[in-house]
Amino acid sequence: HQPICDVLAMHAAELVFKYVYRAYRKPDDEEAREKMCEASLIAGLAFTLPKTTSSHACSFPLTNIYHIPHGEACGLTLDYFIRINAKGEGGECVEEFARRIGFKDAEEMADAVLELKKKMGLRCDLKDLELDDDQIAELVRISRHPNLYNNPVEITDEMLDEMYRYLAGK
């Protein structure tokens, strides 16, 4: 845990929640695009020391096997992992993060992430892939990327299986 990284992450998240939909709706809005560039840079600095975690680890098989763009694949599981991390050991940090960037709690922040994905036409599930049990098992296995071990809450294979089944509509 790095306090300076927390401050950077909070600033980046505030910018994203304020400007991402605006930049999406109006691509010629220079201020919104500039603020999203700033958010991207600051977010990158924020995870330089603590490294990326579960959403990033799960993005690799989704991108490599199913060709879901990397950023969209990271975002696909973000609201799911916000909820898991808020309920686990150290969850008070996630709750505090959510409050500091303007949400009532982590649940409301996760709901806002999901709503943004819907409004922007981003993937919110994997139902269209019609994944079978073997494909879900493969996603679980490949998600065991080293970044998964950076997550503040231990993510088990059972948790990954449950998440992928939920996303697949099973």
Regions found by a protein language model. Give the residues of each.
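General structural signal for alpha-helix termini and helix-helix connectors
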Residues: R22-K26, I42-L45, L49, N64, ...
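Alpha-helix N-cap/helix-start motif at coil-to-helix transitions, marked by capping-box chemistry
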Residues: P3-E14, E72, G88, E107, ...
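Hydrophobic residues within well-ordered, non-membrane alpha-helices that form the packing/core
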Residues: V20, F47, I82, K117, ...
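Carboxylate- and glycine-rich phosphate/diphosphate-binding segment that chelates Mg2+/Mn2+
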Residues: H1-P50, P152-E158
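C-terminal catalytic subdomain
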Residues: P50-A106, L114
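C-terminal charged capping/lid subdomain of soluble metabolic enzymes
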Residues: E95, R100-K170
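A general alpha-helix detector
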Residues: L15, Y19, A39-I42, A57-P61, ...
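Amphipathic alpha-helical interaction segments
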Residues: V7-H11, L15, K35-E38, A57-F60, ...
